[in-house]
Amino acid sequence: MNNNVITRFAPSPTGFLHIGSARTALFNYLFARHHNGKFLLRIEDTDKERSTKEAVEAIFSGLKWLGLDWNGEVIFQSKRNNLYKEAALKLLQNGKAYYCFTRQEEIERQRQQALENKQHFIFNSEWRDKDPSIYPTDIKPVIRLKTPREGSITIHDTLQGEVVIENSHIDDMVLLRADGTATYMLAVVVDDHDMGITHIIRGDDHLTNTARQLAIYQAFGYAVPSMTHIPLIHGADGAKLSKRHGALGIEAYKDMGYLPESLCNYLLRLGWSHGDDEIISMTQAIDWFNLDSLGKSPSKLDFAKMNSLNAHYLRMLDNDSLTSKTVEILEQNYNTLLRHLPYREEFGGNTERSTAAYIDIREDASTGLTYKLPLAVELPKKFKISEQEIGYIKQAMPSLLVRSETLLELTRLAQIYLVDSPIIYSQDSKEIIENCDKNLIKQIIENLSELEQFDKESVQNKFKEIAAANDLKLNDIMKPVRALITGMTASPSIFEIAEILGKENILKRLKII
């Protein structure tokens, strides 16, 4: 083990913790932990206009939820500008950089001219070798790197191999802006050196930046960290990952009911493998992770595989843990987890509980993927599940679990057992209720009322008797009964639900018709 290994995750706080960024963080974390090294966190917030505190908090909470704990204090680039300024001035003094007074308007004019001439634009500053004695006093200059005009830069990448870039294709990039703030390129190099980063693992979309950063490394005389640029995650159709493919923040996956252990396992397998192993615990991942097993081709986001893997991890939890997680979600997010249909008083229930929000199900016709997007609405009153309801959910958990791949699906089914809440009827179940034989439902109520034993076998036998007496198939009777009792068209066994909820609750739901 090499305990001198230091990796870093360096997101920009301009939005949520993207799933691709989470995978990058995971790979850096695993590599550091495998070598008993350090995994550092740096927030690249030099873009003051786009960086937000909310995004910083989303990054922190996302990493913590995934279990990717970092070493030491978080580094904020916005607090280190003096360090960057000193570094830029050092290059200036050593003849590796220069003051440039060219106005932005002139640069844009040259860029437009190159575009019109269908030429690749590389800005060549007239101030590169000017004598300081002729510097203007009415213009605030930027500091530019004096990139060598001859030769080339070679990127030694552990995954991509050697990538050679001619110096003539690298511009004299700005290191320090006219207002004295550092650019991304300078800050990254100075920070990686100052933090002692030994290995950089990031997306291959950074590969073009790497050549420019290596030019800065050379100017300073810094040792270059080991570079590994991993292919990006693509959508199921092979296109670059976007929101329509599921390029959501980690918080969204949490809200959709994925477990952190499952998501880490899934992200690990997106571009890394260990033989034929699919189920890999975090402990195993730390033991096994290496850069040699990274794939060179982009991985495709596959929700079916993600769901299947999550179902496996759900089934590894014991009944108490599953019940606790389900109850917690119901209590904290009841208003965003259950599909809403306009409440009708005749459908009964405790009207103090909210039915004011839903999960919006949207299907992308181009990909066939279905997305569940939580819509936040405030609860009018605090929602608290009773001990009796918790008991119902715990008793029903085995049958709920076999029908669920995510905590969201599990919670959706568990709401059947909230006897003090109004039933939330799907549109299909409402249509079944409105079109059903009301006299048949009354007959069912009368027959069930007479039952002394209300276990699932007795209830099932009674329904068979009713079906035979009316010359109907059992399924024909169960459709409206299921809709009335659960608000759904598909659910766990009605006979099991009846046994758990008991006669009084079942009759109450049937009588709302």
From Swiss-Prot:
A motif ('KMSKS' region) lies at residues 240-244. Pfam families: Anticodon_2, tRNA-synt_1c. Its EC number is 6.1.1.17. GO terms for biological process: glutamyl-tRNA aminoacylation. InterPro entries: aa-tRNA-synth_I_cd-bd, aa-tRNA-synth_I_codon-bd_sub2, aa_tRNA-synth_I_cd-bd_sf, Glu-tRNA-ligase_bac/mito, Glu/Gln-tRNA-synth, Glu/Gln-tRNA-synth_Ib_cat-dom, GluQ/Sye, GluRS_core. GO terms for cellular component: cytosol. It comes from the Bacteria. A motif ('HIGH' region) lies at residues 11-21. Monomer. Belongs to the class-I aminoacyl-tRNA synthetase family. Glutamate--tRNA ligase type 1 subfamily. This is Glutamate--tRNA ligase 2. It comes from Rickettsia conorii (strain ATCC VR-613 / Malish 7). The gene is gltX2.
